[in-house]
Amino acid sequence: MGQARRVTVAGFVLALDRRYQPETHMWVLARGPGRVRVGMDPLGVETSGTLAQVSFVPAGTELTAGLPFGQLEAAKFVGPLVSPVSGAVLAVNGAVTRDAGLVERDPYGAGWMIEASLIEASLIEASPGGATVELPGLLADPAEISVWFAAKVADYRLKGLIAQ
């Protein structure tokens, strides 16, 4: 699918070939008809602190958007990883369960978390120039993503959740 178009927003790198769930800081990348890869954006990682452990439900588990698909243990946060999509887990990233630091070091590459099939395969298509995902609750427009992310970083800095 080629190299993702990336931009730097407020000091964080954003990949614009994927869609973002603003409340949970999860991203969704089309991997083919009805198939997506899910991971955590760099701001979600930053606000969690140093990651100690990540665990996921097993492949074959049904996913419901808004419900947990795993758990994250970090310096500043212990809690659920919330699915941005409904469907079924096709694969989990075993490398991340062995080395949670992959999510910090390479959130858009080796640090992906799960691959899933979607309930409605017609909602997603992969295109040669990037991915188009049309799912409720996910930001899709690159300009909208950048504005949301910059505002969230400013808010978190104001609240002292991340460094200036």
Language model regions located:
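Gly/Ser/Thr-rich beta-alpha loop segments that engage phosphate groups in nucleotides
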Residues: 62, 72, 89
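Non-catalytic terminal segments and appended small domains
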Residues: 1-65, 92-164
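Small beta-strand-rich domains/subdomains or short beta-sheet motifs embedded
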Residues: 55, 73-74, 79-83
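Short glycine-rich loop/turn motifs that provide flexible caps or phosphate-binding loops at active sites
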Residues: 48, 69, 86
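Short coil-to-beta-strand transition motifs
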Residues: 18-22, 79-88
